[in-house]
């Protein structure tokens, strides 16, 4: 293996990258609460893997969505475990994100020169909540349907553009197939890509600036 590594290192210069990744200085005041952001990332990766697996069986139509989820839970080998892990990690991600935000705020991690790190973190928090809203509707049961109807109707309170926003979200006047298609696309494509981009920016800035010092 050493010969293979040496061959790759000679061409790709792996050693400097490994040294930089593993040799970063960790301030002595860092404790377990500084791991909350990393746990949030782990939860996201778990959801990505389990969600990708479920796309092989889920059908995003109003006629088949509920039955396809039921099929995953009752017919697919370990499908019940797959979906349960997806749901548990989703709840854990939201909890860890909230605790991480509080930790950063209470320790002053948002102050100069880390304002942009804080901004990307806030965007990631919004994306995390958006995951929950869009994913909640995908089983298309009574809870999911009425949740979508209520959430998609909230923008109607906005003056002038409110009704147009509601129609844009729903794909028409009423909640239906177009709404489910939009939420499915957001949940499985748009939001994961946006989250991956902003997480990369977030972690690169942390690597560049380091962990903030104690108050």
Curated annotation (Swiss-Prot):
Its main location: membrane. This is Cytochrome b6. The keyword Transport applies. One of its GO terms (molecular function) is metal ion binding. Component of the cytochrome b6-f complex, which mediates electron transfer between photosystem II (PSII) and photosystem I (PSI), cyclic electron flow around PSI, and state transitions. Binds 2 heme b groups non-covalently with two histidine residues as axial ligands. Binds one heme group covalently by a single cysteine link with no axial amino acid ligand. This heme was named heme ci. One of its GO terms (cellular component) is plasma membrane-derived thylakoid membrane. Heme b 1 binds at residues 100, 202. Its cofactor is heme b; heme c. Heme b 2 binds at residues 86, 187. NCBIfam families: PRK03735.1. It is a multi-pass membrane protein. The chain crosses the membrane at residues 32-52, 90-110, 116-136, 186-206. Pfam families: Cytochrome_B. Keywords: Electron transport, Heme, Iron, Membrane, Metal-binding, Photosynthesis, Thylakoid, Transmembrane, Transmembrane helix, Transport. One of its GO terms (biological process) is photosynthesis. InterPro entries: Cyt_b/b6_N, Cyt_B6_PetB, Cytb/b6-like_sf, Cytochrome_b_N_euk/bac, Di-haem_cyt_TM. It comes from Synechococcus sp. (strain JA-3-3Ab). Heme 1 (or BH or b566) is high-potential and absorbs at about 566 nm, and heme 2 (or BL or b562) is low-potential and absorbs at about 562 nm. It is found in: Cellular thylakoid membrane. The 4 large subunits of the cytochrome b6-f complex are cytochrome b6, subunit IV (17 kDa polypeptide, PetD), cytochrome f and the Rieske protein, while the 4 small subunits are PetG, PetL, PetM and PetN. The complex functions as a dimer. Heme c binds at residue 35. Belongs to the cytochrome b family. PetB subfamily.
